[in-house]
Regions:
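Mid-to-C-terminal secondary-structure elements
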Residues: 120-133, 146-258
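Membrane-proximal extracellular/periplasmic loop immediately following the first transmembrane helix
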Residues: 37-102, 210-211, 215-227, 234-238, ...
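Generic structural signal for small/hydrophobic residues in well-ordered secondary structure
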Residues: 13-16, 23, 44, 60, ...
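Structural preference for long, well-ordered alpha-helical segments in enzyme cores
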Residues: 9, 24, 28, 40, ...
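Extracytoplasmic
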Residues: 55-57, 89, 111, 141-145, ...
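Membrane-helix entry/capping segments
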Residues: 1-11, 15-19, 51-52, 236-258
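Short, strongly hydrophobic transmembrane alpha-helices
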Residues: 16-43
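Short acidic/polar micro-motifs at solvent-exposed secondary-structure junctions
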Residues: 62-73, 96-122, 132-146, 170-172, ...
Length: 258
């Protein structure tokens, strides 16, 4: 019976070649599009899901009111980082980071460009990226430390234990490896192969030191971890006027959480 069905199908295909090609092509395109849409939806819904507390973490943004328009920025003044810690009882922690970028990482005669971040010591506690070596709560405590990815550790150290070894960054800073984290998934907002303590940046970059208490320079990223039962709108209400209180210009600028 199956053989007869196949023979009949083949005869119909030969008899109506053009019609069959159109139908088969349409079906193939439809299936391909459905698979692509399914993969896209799967990627979108799984984005940042590797971060255990993703629903509790919010980035601080600014709405700036100019005449008849509102501009939204995800860059904020540096003192936002410290001021947020006591701004509301439901704010568990705050984190400040740079914007990332490639730097030259060197070990002896090995030199490689890798992307990474300057990040405050709370970063790994808040985002909870899995650690292979080191305690996430302390690996960024020392300003002269560096935490690297599993991949970067393998590239530079092969099978050797990198713990306590030193790396040269941009031919200017010598930093000690204090931890190794698992490679970051592709569907993560953060993509990096190393973390350098924020205090190292403060110590080595004059312009960062100059902006520690400056509310007029919007050059930094700040993230907040909220308590599990926190009402985001309630927290926003308590912090939205901070810029107007601290700033010195007449432009209305309001904090909100994204």
């Amino acid at each position: 019976m199956l053989k007869n069905f196949i023979l009949v199908t083949l005869r119909n295909l030969r008899r109506n070649t053009l019609y069959s090609v159109i139908n088969i092509s349409g079906l193939s395109i439809g299936i391909a599009c459905s698979i692509l849409i399914l993969l896209w939806v799967q990627d979108e819904t799984s984005f940042d899901k590797s971060i255990p507390k993703v629903n509790k973490i919010h980035q601080v943004w600014v709405n700036a009111h100019f005449d008849n328009s509102i501009q939204s920025w995800n860059s904020v003044p540096l003192p936002t980082y410290t001021e947020m810690k006591g701004a509301h009882a439901k704010i568990v922690n705050s984190v400040v980071t740079g914007w990332g970028g490639a730097r030259l990482i060197a070990l002896d005669d090995q030199r490689i460009m890798k992307d990474g971040y300057f990040a405050s010591k709370e970063f790994l506690d808040v985002f909870e990226f899995p650690m292979l070596v080191g305690d996430r709560s302390t690996v960024l405590d020392d300003p002269s430390s560096i935490v690297i990815s599993e991949e970067l550790a393998k590239v530079l150290f092969k099978d050797e234990d990198p713990g306590g070894k030193f790396l040269k960054v941009d031919d200017t800073s010598t930093l000690q490896v204090t931890g190794i984290f698992k490679d970051i998934p592709d569907n993560s907002s953060f993509q990096f192969d190393y973390l350098i303590p924020w205090q190292h940046r403060v110590a080595t970059e004059q312009w960062v030191r100059n902006n520690t208490t400056n509310w007029g320079n919007y050059s930094f990223q700040v993230f907040l971890e909220l308590n599990g039962d926190a009402d985001q709108l309630e927290v926003e209400e308590s912090i939205k006027g901070m810029l107007m209180e601290k700033g010195q210009d007449d432009i209305e600028r309001i904090f909100f959480l994204h």
